[in-house]
């Protein structure tokens, strides 16, 4: 199964879409990866999430975030077709600046995306400022560690001229120390990036729990 979520804001309606049935990235805090990846969604299937959402709420969708089930850059070709279709006047005509694409950090695909110079927002699921913690949370970090990922993100920003966002799920006793905060600040210094601090949601089978509210 997949999920599609509509979020209403004062500036319009945002829909969060899935790009795969399941996910093979294995992030240890994520429920959607527990059964692995079943298959990629085709571009038309991702588009249908938008059309179905618009039909259900009876209102236009103005913003899209590719942050549902699946790793968008692990389904690169179909996601690129989806973006082309959904942003065209013949589609929903949603401008690229109103689209955000999330990735856990597939560096070759980040570079490939940068070459297209799309004006969307890249949102990097970082969740830790160093390899020791990040590899414990996200197996992808073993292939693309922080010292490889961050230069790729900077290259993306330099190539596209777009601000990058970093997602950081706060996990009690794991990545929420003052030392982690300082390391994170050093990591993104000079980027003009946005950091989204998220209380982690409890997941069955996961040892992680959310940081207490400040």
Regions found by a protein language model. Name each.
Residues 34-63:
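Conserved alpha-helical substructure of the radical SAM core
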Residues 1-8:
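Long amphipathic N-terminal alpha/beta scaffold segment
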Residues 54-63, 68-213:
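Conserved AdoMet/S-adenosylmethionine-binding subsite of the radical SAM
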Residues 4, 15-17, 122-124:
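Short beta-strand motif preference
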Residues 8-45:
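Canonical Radical SAM [4Fe-4S] cluster-binding loop centered on the CxxxCxxC motif
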């Amino acid at each position: 199964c997949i999920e599609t979520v509509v979020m209403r804001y004062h500036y319009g309606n945002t829909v969060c879409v899935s790009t795969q049935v399941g996910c093979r990235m294995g992030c240890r805090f994520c429920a959607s990866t527990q059964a692995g990846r079943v298959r990629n969604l085709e571009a038309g299937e991702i588009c249908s999430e938008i059309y179905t959402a618009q039909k259900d709420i009876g209102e236009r969708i103005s913003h899209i975030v590719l942050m549902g089930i699946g790793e968008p850059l692990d389904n690169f070709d179909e996601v690129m077709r989806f973006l082309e279709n959904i942003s065209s006047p013949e589609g929903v005509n949603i401008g690229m600046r109103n689209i955000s694409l999330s990735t856990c950090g597939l560096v070759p695909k980040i570079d490939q995306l940068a070459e297209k110079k799309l004006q969307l927002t890249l949102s990097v699921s970082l969740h830790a400022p160093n390899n020791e913690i990040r590899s414990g949370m996200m197996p992808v970090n073993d292939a693309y560690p922080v010292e490889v990922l961050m230069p790729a993100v900077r290259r993306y920003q330099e190539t596209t001229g777009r601000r990058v966002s970093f997602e950081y799920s706060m996990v009690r006793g794991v990545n929420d120390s003052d030392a982690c905060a300082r390391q994170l600040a050093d990591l993104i210094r000079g980027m003009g990036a946005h950091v989204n601090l998220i209380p982690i949601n409890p997941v069955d089978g996961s040892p992680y729990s959310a940081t207490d509210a400040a």
